[in-house]
């Protein structure tokens, strides 16, 4: 991928929800909720603190994370859908 977020932004590849329930019912696209978890595929360098030093991000490429339902901006690069958001929009890392 040739996308590098700036400052405290990260790029996340959403992990799609199951298309079928445990009982075998197929869920149409219109009824699916927006995924709220994904894998980080790119991170910015960090933000400048009051002293002019760059404070690096805590998250790193490969982390699986939970984020807010309406967080970020959806983009598409080379056919791949990504969500770009600030690191602070992430709730936490999934182990």
Curated annotation (Swiss-Prot):
InterPro entries: Chaperonin_GroES (IPR020818), Chaperonin_GroES_sf (IPR037124), Chaprnonin_Cpn10_CS (IPR018369), GroES-like_sf (IPR011032). NCBIfam families: PRK00364.1-2, PRK00364.1-5, PRK00364.2-2, PRK00364.2-4. The keyword Chaperone applies. Keywords: Chaperone, Cytoplasm. GO terms for biological process: chaperone cofactor-dependent protein refolding. It is found in: Cytoplasm. This is Co-chaperonin GroES. GO terms for molecular function: ATP binding; metal ion binding; protein folding chaperone; protein-folding chaperone binding; unfolded protein binding. Together with the chaperonin GroEL, plays an essential role in assisting protein folding. The GroEL-GroES system forms a nano-cage that allows encapsulation of the non-native substrate proteins and provides a physical environment optimized to promote and accelerate protein folding. GroES binds to the apical surface of the GroEL ring, thereby capping the opening of the GroEL channel. CDD domains: cpn10. The keyword Chaperone applies. The gene is groES. PANTHER family: 10 KDA HEAT SHOCK PROTEIN, CO-CHAPERONIN GROES. Belongs to the GroES chaperonin family. It holds the Pfam family Cpn10. Heptamer of 7 subunits arranged in a ring. Interacts with the chaperonin GroEL. It comes from the Bacteria.
